[in-house]
Amino acid sequence: MSQEFNVVVLGASGAVGQTMIEILEERNFPVAKLFPLASSRSAGGTVSFNGKQVEILDVDDFDWSQAQIGFFSAGGDVSEKWAPIAAENGCVVIDNTSQFRYDNDVPLVIPEVNPEAIADFRNRNIIANPNCSTIQMLVALKPIYDAFGISRINVATYQSVSGSGKEAITELAGQCSKLLQGLPAESKVYPKQIAFNVLPQIDKFMENGYTKEEMKMVWETQKIFGDDNIVVNPTAVRVPVFYGHSEAIHLETIQPAEAEDVKAVLREAPGIELFESNEEYPTAVTESAGTDPVYVGRVRKDISHSHGINLWVVSDNIRKGAALNSVQIAEVLIRDYY
């Protein structure tokens, strides 16, 4: 990777954009020049990169022919407007929104799961980053899927407020502070109080009674695995945790598997840190927050189903669930296609 690339981070003032810039530096991505971009409201500020302060530029004034790789994390409307323009000017867009995920000609990629799909970036010069909850689930399930097959996935998520952005983090902190002082909590980001509470709604409700967040996990799992026969039954829940998503997953495998068989394939899988004993298990706060792996624990045989396996999966939704996965896509892109 001696070649260097001019890199755009669109949404550089947001939590995911800032983390992308940190990870580009941490992983020594070959950046010739970094262009942090944002709306006019956020332009003029700076970000730190490789020991220097780099000015955040106004996306409206940017010449896209200057960049070869663009990381987009500024919302679906922004990606809808700017990704085609960037792509037409030769910038490969790695988009962290849901704008292009379900387009048949746009690859949806988790490098540990389906890196070969990146080859299809040539269709439109756009690669989609999956939803955070899908990413950590499929990193954990890919080795099981390959070894035993999976016919059905039941999953309940416990998703931190950082998945809703900086305003949600501020709202949780503010509500906690007020409630502990005996004052009423005000809710703006969420429909109900999030502090000391759990909300069984993430995103809007669909006609079938599932939320859009839940249906993302269905659609994305089938697309990434290339398997329309796999059945996914999700319930997505927002919990009063700042960083890190957790998932309780029940699988039905095609071939029967014991817990030790599943642990054996997880032990060798990329991107996974396995907790093997019953007494040790990962949590979003104590293990995943601020780290890169997908953590798996509580692996056990389902006592109610002969082909059932249960496991507990946690990961940092801002890192592996968004920024890190995007940078890993770019690493495969420049390694295999440049």
From Swiss-Prot:
NADP(+) binds at S13, G14, A15, V16, R41, S42, S162, G163, N317. InterPro entries: Asp_semialdehyde_DH, Asp_semialdehyde_DH_beta, NAD(P)-bd_dom_sf, Semialdehyde_DH_NAD-bd, Semialdhyde_DH_dimer_dom. Gene3D superfamilies: Dihydrodipicolinate Reductase, domain 2, NAD(P)-binding Rossmann-like Domain. Disulfide bonds: none annotated. It catalyses: L-aspartate 4-semialdehyde + phosphate + NADP(+) = 4-phospho-L-aspartate + NADPH + H(+). GO terms for molecular function: aspartate-semialdehyde dehydrogenase activity; NAD binding; NADP binding; protein dimerization activity. Keywords: Amino-acid biosynthesis, Diaminopimelate biosynthesis, Lysine biosynthesis, Methionine biosynthesis, NADP, Oxidoreductase, Threonine biosynthesis. Substrate binds at Q159, R238. Belongs to the aspartate-semialdehyde dehydrogenase family. This is Aspartate-semialdehyde dehydrogenase.
